[in-house]
Amino acid sequence: IVVAALFTISASWSALATGYTEFIIARIIGGVGIGGAILIAPIYIAEIAPPKLRGSLVSFNQLNIVIGISVAYFSNYFLVNMEGESWRWMLGVEAIPALIYFLALWTVPRSPRWLILKLNKVEHAKKIMTKIGGEDYAEITIAEIQRGIDKKEENAKLSDIFKSKYATIMIIALGIAFFQQITGINAVFYYAPTIFEQAGGSTDSSFLQAIVVGLTNLVFTLVAIWLIDKLGRKPLLLIGTSFMTVALLMATFAFNSATYNFNAATLEKVNDTEIRTALTSLEGKTFTSQSELFNVVQTKLDEEKFLNFKRNEITNFIQINATLVLIAILLYVASFAISLG
């Protein structure tokens, strides 16, 4: 419930922010909410679900995250061309599902395990478990929890997980969690429209391609759920991470091969007349890196026009294999979905 409240506050405040500091604080609040939800939701599902459904329901938690990302891409595509500050609507619309989530959580029962372990409310927990899986399931689960309490009283310590017999398990668990984030998947999801725009696409086509990214993620998450019990987790991890490596190398090659060309045709595409006039002297020049380009262009424009160039005009000059970028990103997302996702 607290997490859902943080989502609602973050979305509303982000949309209404009047300054940079306010906006950053609002986004941090949302980040705290996301961190909490990612941790709490699967734990709650694991505690409340019957054993035969536990694996599937935890998988569906990830599937719902993927569906949410896809819905966000669709929403952004339809909102991007709104008059005024469309970004406010893109962020503010999140408050609707966040509020629904907040209200719906009041109907969700507390974790039976938590009720027994923390409050010793055995009868309350039994009623909840009976509704979920019947009386037999409730009796068996309560007995398991009671045995867990007895074992807990044997003075197990947190430091025990660092003992040598648990070392391999700890390394694997921490390694997967670390590499899941360090691969940069969140940057790809968050900046997908920007990546495609910098690859030479228009704003509309960039947001449309981001939808394709979301749908690819959704489809291959479903594939992973279907394959995980057939092939096992380790083969999927090996296959997925191998193709992720290939995809990142493809994207690196595409962006590293990009050039920025100034000629009559590319200059004609510039909408801002003052920028076009100021950059006419660069006609015939080609830049092989963005930093080199910015160093030169910055000497031709004042600060405001330079920012406008970076935000809106730079894509007019880039020459890049956009198809290779799209294939690389889609392969990367698909590979992540079946392995680390």
Residue ranges and their predicted role:
Residues 1-133, 137-341:
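Transmembrane-helix signature of 12-pass secondary carriers
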